[in-house]
Amino acid sequence: MFMARQVLRNGLFLRSLAPIKITARTVASANAGIKRKSRFDKTMIKPLLLVMIFGSILNAVIAEKRNIIDMERKYKLKLDKLKELIRRVHDNNGKVDFDADDELKLVNLRLGIVGKNATGMKEDETDIVVPKEESLEEIWQSIIDEAKKEVIEKTPDAGVKNKEGIVTDLNVLKDLEKSKKEDEKVYLSGDVHMMMNQPGDLNEIAKEHDKIPKFL
């Protein structure tokens, strides 16, 4: 009898525990649902998308409006320039004393209108000749040539020649003979060799040698 009562009590106890477990599960699942809902809140996605779309449209409209205003300003400048040219022609009694292309060149550049000679300018740029670097020998030779031009005496005038081109003036002939003899005296002597530490340093050589016999 005692055992039967004990079994009945245990059964009733287990039955009373069953609803408690069910309620605990439901509470746990509800809490999990609440947490998931707070993590993945999708209520702000739609407003953000709307704001981004509206902002991009607004920026595009503002940029287009600026372009229109800039274009209107440029065309207004061109119209004002054309009116000025018309007034100049009218004041000059219908005579055109200017080049319309040159006058409108700056305005056309502002409008992005390229003149007729644009392609020609591009072709000319490719034909630019880059000057080559001159060597030291060429520079030295050019200096010598310039010095010779300065030393060359005056050539006989046409008045001292006859019809056949022969010089007949005695004074001119003497001068020519004298200059020819002086030219024959000038020669390059290889007997004396000048040694220097640095090329072109003639001051040091002048200190060592009292006299330089010849220098070219």
From Swiss-Prot:
Q: Organism's domain of life?
A: Eukaryota
Cell location: Mitochondrion inner membrane
* UniProt keyword Metal-binding present: no
Record keyword Transmembrane present: yes
Which residues does the entry place in the Mitochondrial intermembrane compartment? 64-216
Q: What is its main location?
A: mitochondrion
Chain ranges passing through the membrane: 44-63
Span of the transit peptide along the chain? 1-26
Chain coiled-coil ranges: 64-93
What are the BP-aspect GO terms?
mitochondrial proton-transporting ATP synthase complex assembly
Q: Which residues lie on this side of the membrane: Mitochondrial matrix?
A: 27-43
Topology relative to the membrane, per the entry?
Single-pass membrane protein
Ordered alphabetically, the record's keywords are: Chaperone, Coiled coil, Membrane, Mitochondrion, Mitochondrion inner membrane, Transit peptide, Transmembrane, Transmembrane helix
Would you tell me the Gene Ontology cellular component terms? INA complex; mitochondrial inner membrane; mitochondrial inner membrane assembly complex; mitochondrion
Q: What do we know about how this protein assembles, alone or with others?
A: Component of the inner membrane assembly (INA) complex, composed of INA17 and INA22. Interacts with a subset of F(1)F(0)-ATP synthase subunits of the F(1)-domain and the peripheral stalk.
- UniProt function note: Component of the INA complex (INAC) that promotes the biogenesis of mitochondrial F(1)F(0)-ATP synthase. INAC facilitates the assembly of the peripheral stalk and promotes the assembly of the catalytic F(1)-domain with the membrane-embedded F(0)-domain.
The miscellaneous remark of the record is: Present with 589 molecules/cell in log phase SD medium.
This chain belongs to which protein, by name? Answer: Inner membrane assembly complex subunit 22
- Name its species: Saccharomyces cerevisiae (strain ATCC 204508 / S288c) (Baker's yeast)
Gene (name only): INA22
